[in-house]
Amino acid sequence: MNTQLNNLILPIYMDYQATTPLDPRVMEAMLPYFTTKFGNPHSHSHSFGWEAENAVEEARGDIAKLIGAEAKEIIFTSGATESNNLAIKGIAKFYGNKKNHIITVVSEHKCVLDACRHLEQEGVKVTYLPIKPNGIIDLEVLKNAITDQTMLVSVMAVNNEIGVIQPLKEIGKICREKGVFFHSDSAQGFGKVPIDVNECNIDLASISGHKIYGPKGIGALYVRKKPRVRITPLINGGGQERGMRSGTLPTPLIVGLGTAANIAYNEMEKDTKHVNHLFDKFLDAINSQISEVYLNGDKDQRYKGNLNLSFAGVEGESIILAIKDLAVSSGSACTSASLEPSYVLRSMGVDEELAHTSIRFGIGRFTTEQEIDYAVKLICSKINKLRDLSPLWEMMQEGIDLKKIKWATH
């Protein structure tokens, strides 16, 4: 239920890592393909089909352009979860009779970790690399983990929970030198940070529409043609998408993804400037008014549309309830329904108490200065109020180490 306050529409959306609103320009581009331009892009005997096919191919080119790829290297899927599964399982199934080792990272998105666990049940060996306290992998540890049995390294571009950017160029160089395929889940990075698949030697990259102001239900997988990468399809049928992903293509959604990619290509610099300014404003204001607030993840090597903050002494769930006028989350939208502390924060070495106090704030293209001002004011008043009520905060101020307390059970 939306309410209005001094030209502000409440609640304020600050969960841009979970999803983004559809850019009105994207909606406008999509609409004709639901109504008058409804043809099947695989129908080659009449103008309805040709028109739809042209729109699909134009979108394919716009998506490729954003990552320095060729249009033919873009395979359409239903979203980044499918793309990640297709990349990881597709490589394992195609090359599995020659090699049987995959390397990924403990802080990857759930769908990458679950795809790898699924392959482990089928006999594939998986190494889960640790991350440093700043959320970034150690390149030496990666180098040492690669064996002659390694077929794939999968490392995400931008982390969905803490926003850190992994050193893709250096990872790609190591993989290319060792003759290992490099997959990157780029759902949170595509269209937000510069990614060049050739510069970074990326062989496979997963893309999502709804993370870049495009529609839900559409994504893509970049699959390198030179040197050629082969994958076994997960879905069999009419052989669409170079035989890698069968099924009639959803033209309106593809047009939406292509338009969103084109806008990102033209406006990335402007978006980055806007987001960086609001990030600095938000963080400086919070730090100046609240003590013991910790930014999770490297401050510089990050996409600044993601602020994951821990507020010592206050439970994350109680913060969310207290700041109902802000739409935020306590971690990945796919796992924030559980009361377990974030596995990403735990793998960075953040202790359990502090991990429980973390909130992820998302800033995006449509966030305004006025919204940031309101958010800061609300957060500061509520956090200070919650701390006044918290016996744990009081004990911390008295220098008592909460870890050493033996709590009585009743």
Swiss-Prot record:
EC number in record: 2.8.1.7
Pathway the protein contributes to: Cofactor biosynthesis; iron-sulfur cluster biosynthesis
Pfam assignment, any one: Aminotran_5
Cystine pairs: none
Subcellular location(s) of the protein: Cytoplasm
Major subcellular site: cytoplasm
Annotated catalysed reactions: (sulfur carrier)-H + L-cysteine = (sulfur carrier)-SH + L-alanine
Binding of [2Fe-2S] cluster, residues: C334
Gene Ontology molecular function: 2 iron, 2 sulfur cluster binding; cysteine desulfurase activity; metal ion binding; pyridoxal phosphate binding
SUPFAM superfamilies for this protein: PLP-dependent transferases (SSF53383)
Superkingdom of source: Bacteria
Catalytic-site annotation from UniProt: C334 (cysteine persulfide intermediate)
Oligomer status and interactors: Homodimer. Forms a heterotetramer with IscU, interacts with other sulfur acceptors.
Family: Belongs to the class-V pyridoxal-phosphate-dependent aminotransferase family. NifS/IscS subfamily.
Function summary: Master enzyme that delivers sulfur to a number of partners involved in Fe-S cluster assembly, tRNA modification or cofactor biosynthesis. Catalyzes the removal of elemental sulfur atoms from cysteine to produce alanine. Functions as a sulfur delivery protein for Fe-S cluster synthesis onto IscU, an Fe-S scaffold assembly protein, as well as other S acceptor proteins.
Listed name of the protein: Cysteine desulfurase IscS
Organism: Rickettsia bellii (strain RML369-C)
Lineage: Bacteria, Pseudomonadati, Pseudomonadota, Alphaproteobacteria, Rickettsiales
